[in-house]
């Protein structure tokens, strides 16, 4: 497995399209518009970049994208009561493979550690709190709201 930071147009496309592969048989999943996902990572459109940073990765195995994740922090976030500096992760998608999932989360954790953060919260979104927060753990038979994280039954 090879994890790569998303930098090229192809990698940006792979980052978006992996969710379609993960949920291809899920009738209730609502695919977000590419522009809605891209807006989160666009410095011109997302005000969170003024006080924070985000990085995203895709995970490849044998030439196929098998997962993705993003990590981020905001300098305006106040330390928790226990004085921990908390960064975030989100946009996690992965095939049913624990080793792959661990690599994605560990990569996010290490990046945040390098930036001086002690802890990681997620799944959350870099920026506004009105979309892509939380993890669906049950209720897969119910159609979700648009811009709500979906999930697989093996995620929790």
Name each region found by the language model.
Residues 2-5, 58, 88:
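Conserved beta-strand positions that form and line the central face of beta-propeller blades
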Residues 73-75:
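A short acidic/small-residue loop/turn micro-motif
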Residues 13, 17-24, 60, 106, ...:
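A broad, structural surface signal
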Residues 42-58:
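A short helix-loop-beta-strand connector motif used in the catalytic cores of GNAT acetyltransferases and
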Residues 1-44:
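Short amphipathic alpha-helix that is part of the acyltransferase structural core
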Residues 79-156:
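Acyl-donor binding region in acyl/amide transferases
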Residues 33-37, 77-82:
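An N-terminal domain-start capping segment
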Residues 54-69:
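Conserved beta-hairpin
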């Amino acid at each position: 497995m090879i994890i790569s930071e998303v930098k090229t147009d192809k990698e940006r496309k792979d980052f978006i399209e992996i969710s379609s592969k993960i949920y291809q048989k899920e009738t209730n999943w609502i695919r977000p518009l590419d522009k809605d996902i891209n807006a989160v990572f666009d410095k011109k459109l997302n005000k969170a970049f003024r006080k924070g940073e985000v990085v995203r990765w895709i995970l490849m195995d044998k030439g196929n994208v098998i997962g993705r994740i993003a990590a981020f922090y905001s300098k305006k976030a106040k330390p928790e009561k226990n004085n921990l500096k908390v960064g975030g992760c989100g946009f996690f998608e992965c095939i049913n493979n624990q080793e792959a999932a661990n690599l994605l989360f560990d990569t996010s954790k290490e990046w945040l550690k390098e930036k001086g953060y002690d802890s990681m919260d997620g799944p959350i979104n870099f920026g506004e709190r009105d979309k892509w927060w939380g993890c669906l753990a049950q209720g897969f038979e119910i159609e979700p709201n648009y811009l709500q994280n979906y999930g697989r039954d093996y995620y929790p």
